[in-house]
């Protein structure tokens, strides 16, 4: 038997669908929102609906954007000869915090994971290959240092090998099985500096 009205239970259920949010955290978030002034709740809801309605993926790199192409792809000061390949848009935010990389990005929107039924056709590898031109000299593979990230990096390296582009992998320093999102700036900076050709 639940102690909350149906509307509260539904909100808890929706929050619990978010990554890293369990039932207790979902309950705390729900109760916090219900205790906010009405105008703050309206602003929160408005921001959520606006973000969902206006944010899309950049047609070039796959990052989140409200303009197409995104601010990074359309920035004339970015080094167009280097593309850093990441698994998710959040990884771009992590890389940008380091302030060591001035090239372009490519978001795969996942990784190769046979255990989860994801193959190369399920992520944005074809789109990466389509971006290869004479201007691109290096592709840095910054997939996560876990089994899926390594498999994805090796597959991409194999696909790009005949295209006469240098393919490098970020260096050690990111723990195996770790997630790029949780790496500190110094570690990520060193991993980028020490990248190896594959």
UniProtKB/Swiss-Prot annotation:
InterPro entries in the record: DNA_Rcmb_RecR, Rcmb_RecR, Rcmb_RecR_Znf, TOPRIM_dom, TOPRIM_RecR
Molecular function GO terms recorded: DNA binding; zinc ion binding
GO biological processes: DNA recombination; DNA repair
Highest taxon of the lineage: Bacteria
Zinc-finger ranges (C4-type): 58-73
Domain Toprim residues, every copy: 81-175
Gene3D superfamilies per UniProt: 3.30.60.80, 3.40.1360.10, 6.10.250.240, RecR Domain 1
Signal sequence, start to end: none
A Pfam family per the record: RecR_HhH
Keyword field: DNA damage, DNA recombination, DNA repair, Metal-binding, Zinc, Zinc-finger
Family membership noted in the UniProt record: Belongs to the RecR family.
Function: May play a role in DNA repair. It seems to be involved in an RecBC-independent recombinational process of DNA repair. It may act with RecF and RecO.
Protein name as it appears in the record: Recombination protein RecR
Biological source species: Clostridium botulinum (strain Alaska E43 / Type E3)
Taxonomic lineage of the native organism: Bacteria, Bacillati, Bacillota, Clostridia, Eubacteriales
Gene that encodes the chain: recR
């Amino acid at each position: 038997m639940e102690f909350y009205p149906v509307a509260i239970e539904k909100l808890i259920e929706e929050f619990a669908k978010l990554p890293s949010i369990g039932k207790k955290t979902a309950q705390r978030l729900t109760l916090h929102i219900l205790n906010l002034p009405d105008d703050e709740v309206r602003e929160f809801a408005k921001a959520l609906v606006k973000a969902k309605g206006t944010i899309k993926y950049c047609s070039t790199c796959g990052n989140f954007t409200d303009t197409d192409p995104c601010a990074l792809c359309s920035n004339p000061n970015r080094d167009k000869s280097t593309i850093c390949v990441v698994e998710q848009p959040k990884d771009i935010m992590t890389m940008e915090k380091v302030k060591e990389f001035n090239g372009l990005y490519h978001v795969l929107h996942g990784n190769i994971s046979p255990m989860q039924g994801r193959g190369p056709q399920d992520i944005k590898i074809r789109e990466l290959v389509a971006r290869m031109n004479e201007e691109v000299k290096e592709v840095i593979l910054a997939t996560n240092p876990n089994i899926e990230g390594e498999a994805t990096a090796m597959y991409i390296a194999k696909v790009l090998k005949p295209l006469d582009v240098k393919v490098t992998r970020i260096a050690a320093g990111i723990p195996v099985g770790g997630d790029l999102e949780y790496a500190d700036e110094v570690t990520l900076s060193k991993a980028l500096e020490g990248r190896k050709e594959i």
